[in-house]
């Protein structure tokens, strides 16, 4: 095993920034072979704390690499808190054998990795899991049949149902999953610095492809034949089909024993699935906590890490089970989600008005959609877009293919907490049409900022 000086220095600096206990030193053994039941060998790195009394063992499994400095600092932070940490590359990624197929193999591969973990002389007898996005999905895969020695999990911004993520609106989430597939397809080329730069440039890279008709040849050239799942996803528009059932891990929500901390952001692409995870686990009586910040899928990482460490050391478990950030306000501690709230009903009126009274009959509001000038995606719960999250959407609201309905100036501040519902009577000339509804906050100067979609 060798010391990773850069990872340790980065972990120490991040530890200090987050106000966590002083980081211990650690050593790293890289590219350890881990056998799977079908003969494939997956590679893992082991971060070993230099202490006689380790805090425990953590397992992380994901497709995004092990060698990049951000990954090493992230894992090193936990090792610096005294944990043995195993970071494994899922099959077909970064030296692990087999083919990467999102959602497939993770249940069996996770179980086989735990079997290997039990055989290691340094294993502490119990382990926990942590990780975000796909590293949260692999945790849920392991929780389909929770190992007896898995004591707790911290699942951050993770789906349990890929079909729902890709097709839940009735149309394919093209920008999100073409972008994600592109990043996965080429992430291994050029080292970790180029990987970061490629990720930052993804929205710009995607733009000409998304504007090309027909899309198929342009998308195929972008992906370079490296993502066979992408075309299969396009061919499976029913999220409840057997295909998607085989890639999902919703069974974990019926089986896991907990305890679990779920972390998401109001503008995270998988926020709705995290809230569903919380509701289903709470309904079963599982010990589950929830943290919701003002984050997108790509932000809030350091705060989520701090929440994870506090959960693992027991202090977060002793606090209120639900912590949410009211955007523009304070963090609130709650006993449950959603909290008791007063329902408000607003009605669309002719003349672009939004009022609490029902409208009299009137002419319908209409707009014309031009496929040559599609309505852009601006802000919101996007996965890889550079324009995700809270954003000034004033120009979007002023487009001729967008209808707006606005309240009078509100006499007092209103906290919007809960799930909004929209009942809309509509018809279109073209049966192949999608409608998108957004709630935005209009400032006194007329500028509009999205709240939720």
Describe the residue ranges of each PLM region.
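Accessory cap/linker subdomain of secreted extracellular hydrolases
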Residues: 80, 144-255
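Alpha/beta-hydrolase fold nucleophile elbow
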Residues: 121-134
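Active-site-adjacent alpha-helix of alpha/beta-hydrolase-fold enzymes
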Residues: 272-287
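C-terminal, loop-rich substrate-recognition/catalytic regions characterized by aromatic stacking residues
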Residues: 2, 201-204, 210-213, 291-293, ...
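N-terminal cap/lid segment of alpha/beta-hydrolase-fold proteins
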Residues: 16-51, 406-412, 425
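Short beta-strand/loop motif that positions the catalytic acidic residue
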Residues: 256, 262-264
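Proline/glycine-enriched tight loop/beta-turn segments at coil->beta junctions
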Residues: 40-42, 49-58, 123, 255-257
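Cap/lid segment of the alpha/beta-hydrolase catalytic domain
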Residues: 49-119, 166, 174, 431, ...
């Amino acid at each position: 095993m060798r010391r990773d000086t850069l990872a340790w220095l980065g972990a120490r600096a991040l530890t200090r920034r987050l106000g966590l206990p002083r980081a211990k030193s650690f050593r790293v053994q890289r590219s350890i072979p881990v056998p799977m039941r079908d003969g494939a060998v997956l590679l893992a790195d082991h971060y070993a704390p230099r202490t006689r009394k380790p805090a425990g063992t953590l397992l992380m499994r994901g497709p995004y690499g092990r060698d990049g400095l951000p990954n090493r600092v992230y894992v090193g932070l936990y090792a610096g808190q005294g944990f043995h940490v195993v970071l494994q590359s899922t099959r077909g990624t970064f030296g692990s054998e087999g083919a990467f197929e999102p959602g497939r193999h993770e249940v069996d591969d996770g179980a086989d990795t735990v079997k290997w973990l039990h055989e290691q002389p340094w294993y502490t007898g119990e382990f926990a899991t942590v990780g975000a996005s796909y590293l949260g999905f692999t945790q849920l895969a392991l929780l389909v049949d929770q190992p007896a020695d898995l004591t707790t999990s911290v699942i951050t911004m993770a789906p349990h149902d890929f079909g729902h993520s890709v097709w839940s609106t009735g149309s394919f989430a093209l920008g999100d999953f073409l972008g994600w597939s592109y990043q996965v397809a080429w992430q291994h080329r050029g080292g970790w610095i180029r990987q970061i730069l490629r990720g930052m440039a993804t929205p710009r890279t995607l733009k000409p492809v998304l504007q090309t008709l027909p899309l198929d040849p342009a998308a195929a050239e972008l992906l370079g034949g490296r993502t066979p799942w992408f075309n299969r996803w396009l061919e499976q528009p029913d999220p409840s089909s057997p295909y998607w059932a085989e890639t999902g891990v919703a069974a974990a929500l019926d089986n896991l024993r907990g305890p679990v901390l779920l972390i998401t952001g109001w503008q995270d692409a998988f926020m709705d699935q995290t809230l569903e995870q919380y509701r289903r686990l709470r309904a079963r009586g599982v010990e589950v906590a929830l943290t919701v910040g003002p984050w997108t899928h790509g932000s809030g990482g350091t705060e989520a890490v701090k929440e994870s460490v506090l959960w693992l050391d027991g202090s977060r478990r002793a606090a209120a089970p639900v912590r949410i950030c009211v955007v523009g306000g304070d963090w609130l501690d709650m006993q449950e989600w959603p909290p008791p709230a007063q329902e408000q009903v607003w009605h669309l009126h002719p003349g672009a008005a939004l009022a609490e009274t029902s409208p009299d009959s009137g002419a319908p509001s209409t707009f014309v959609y031009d496929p040559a000038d599609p309505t852009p995606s601006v802000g919101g719960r996007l996965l890889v877009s550079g324009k995700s999250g809270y954003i000034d959407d004033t120009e979007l609201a002023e487009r001729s293919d967008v209808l707006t309905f606005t309240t009078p100036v509100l006499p007092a501040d209103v906290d919007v907490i809960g799930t909004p519902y929209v009942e809309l009577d509509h018809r279109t000339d073209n049966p192949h049409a999608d409608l998108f509804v957004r709630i935005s906050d209009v400032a006194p100067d007329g500028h509009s900022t999205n709240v939720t979609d």
